Amino acid sequence: MCIRDRRNAVRNGIANAEFICGDAGVCTAQLLERRIQPDVAIVDPPRKGLDGTTIDSLVKMNPERIVYVSCDPATLARDCAVLNERGYGVEVVQPVDMFPQTTHVETVVLMSKVR
């Protein structure tokens, strides 16, 4: 996925973005060590959602916005509640029916720092 993201950025003249693909728990810890503070963090965890360590690292990175892509409404609700307690509010929720004629739905949530 990151290869397509990078190509899309080049095609659109975007030079101030870095794309990192990998396990969020590992990547967030590495970014913290490098003292990286992204403007936007995009997470697309497995069905089990984000673990506590990953949420801790994500919040410590202090992004202005978090885009959370989820295939499980229950873990999405759980993680959004935790992120809300940690200073992020839900701005937009968009369900995406990627699998018509099934009960499965992807949901994209935009969260922003609460001021």
Give residue ranges: language-model regions.
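Rossmann-like S-adenosyl-L-methionine
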Residues: 4-115
